[in-house]
Amino acid sequence: MKITAEMIKELRQQTHAGMIACKQALEKTEGNLQKAIVFLREKGIVKASQKQDRTTSEGLINIVFSQNDAFLYELNSETDFVAKNEHFQQLMKTIGEVILQNKLQSVDEVLTFNYQNKTIQDLLLEKTSILGEKITLKRILKVTKKEEEIFGTYKHQGGRISVLVVLENNHPSIAEDIAMHIAAFNPKFLNPDKVNLQFLTTEKNILQKQTEKQLLEEKKPLHILDKIVQNRLNKLLKEICLSEQPFVKNNEQKVKDYLQNNNTNVVSYFRWSIANQ
């Protein structure tokens, strides 16, 4: 497969690796971007965290509520300047009202919904014409909780990052604290038991290759490989699992201990950042 300049540029944007390294990675993986990223990580050229929060557009994420239902939705613009414009802000509010009042759960449902004798898609096109930038509704998610549970939310930078938490018991301030923590620490999983098996396998393979390379370079015995890999994997899990992270308001206490002390637990959480799935 021919490796193009655009493919190299995209890989460099996501990894910050050098041009030659990106070209070699793409050649080794036959142009597969995700496999090329893993290849660079195995070689120790790039870390996983470097691509996590890159944004491809601007906009805002909002959360609206109706009793036991919450709806997250993301509206994109091309620049931050337009996202702060009153026309964009009003459109954001209108879409939230339409979603909430009609319990709409997909982008298609919203775009085809008739609002004041026009569809929401028509409204987006109107705002695109007024603002001079393409305005798009990217995604929607409905979250339903039980009666005894509670929602907690936190918005960073007005909605560039928005977090929704479902907590077991009715503790509003605790739910908000956990949502703020998630916005800041960006955990990938709720706890070690919830870690995706494919993710775990991929990370372990990468750590094995990195560690083996390091041991060979340092002329150390390979029989210690498995122990080092497991220790590094355990450290990674502590960093990416919500329950194991140091609590944002007290770094001497883990999140799971904070929750246990307050007799509650996190049922689920959703952290959205602009233009990232």
UniProtKB/Swiss-Prot annotation:
CDD domains registered for this protein in UniProt: UBA_EF-Ts (cd14275)
GO MF term set: translation elongation factor activity
One Pfam assignment: EF_TS
Paired cysteines (S-S): none
Major subcellular site: cytoplasm
Keywords: Cytoplasm, Elongation factor, Protein biosynthesis
UniProt superkingdom: Bacteria
GO terms under cellular component: cytoplasm
Task of the protein: Associates with the EF-Tu.GDP complex and induces the exchange of GDP to GTP. It remains bound to the aminoacyl-tRNA.EF-Tu.GTP complex up to the GTP hydrolysis stage on the ribosome.
Family: Belongs to the EF-Ts family.
UniProt-listed NCBIfam families: tsf
Protein name: Elongation factor Ts
Organism: Phytoplasma australiense
Organism ancestry: Bacteria, Bacillati, Mycoplasmatota, Mollicutes, Acholeplasmatales
